């Protein structure tokens, strides 16, 4: 059960999330892996989660009718949000807003087939008061098995 050096799913997700629109991260996505990227901004954490779930489903990163896939994605999203929000998933209640780029990557990072597929969610952007200029950078990463 070795983690393959060329198959670091979290690193791939982070590089995709960090890349600007006009940048293309130098990545070689392994054959059979799936990913999507997008942007989301809100004072409502439920909208942030919903936007990422919708992107993953509409880009066929996860299957819409398989509960364990949605469940794994949800936990990876929440773990990444913990990083962005420093463990406090509240946004609107404490007058905070986020503007984030995200990447969701699905693949097999281990060399053993029995380890199965994993999903990684990376978030990068800003968090702060809902006043332009009153924010700072933040980053989060969540990885979960499917």
Curated annotation (Swiss-Prot):
It comes from the Bacteria. Belongs to the HutP family. Keywords: Activator, Histidine metabolism, RNA-binding, Transcription, Transcription regulation. Homohexamer. InterPro entries: Regulatory_HutP, Regulatory_HutP_bacillales, Regulatory_HutP_sf. The keyword Transferase does not apply. It comes from Bacillus cereus (strain AH820). SUPFAM superfamilies: Hut operon positive regulatory protein HutP. GO terms for molecular function: mRNA binding. One of its GO terms (biological process) is L-histidine metabolic process. The keyword Transcription regulation applies. This is Hut operon positive regulatory protein. The gene is hutP.
């Amino acid at each position: 059960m070795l983690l393959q050096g060329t198959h670091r799913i979290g690193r791939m997700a982070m590089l995709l999330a960090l890349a600007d629109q006009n940048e293309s991260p130098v990545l070689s996505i392994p054959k059979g892996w799936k990913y999507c990227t997008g942007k989301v901004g809100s004072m409502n954490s439920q909208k942030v989660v919903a936007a990422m779930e919708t992107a993953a489903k509409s880009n066929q990163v996860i299957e819409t009718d398989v509960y364990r896939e949605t469940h794994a994605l949800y936990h990876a999203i929440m773990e990444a949000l913990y990083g962005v929000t420093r463990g406090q998933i509240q946004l609107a209640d404490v007058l905070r807003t986020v503007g984030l780029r995200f990447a969701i990557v699905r693949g097999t990072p281990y060399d053993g087939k029995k380890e199965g597929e994993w999903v990684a969610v990376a978030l990068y952007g800003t968090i702060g008061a809902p006043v332009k200029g009153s924010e700072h950078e933040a980053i989060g990463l969540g990885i979960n098995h499917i």
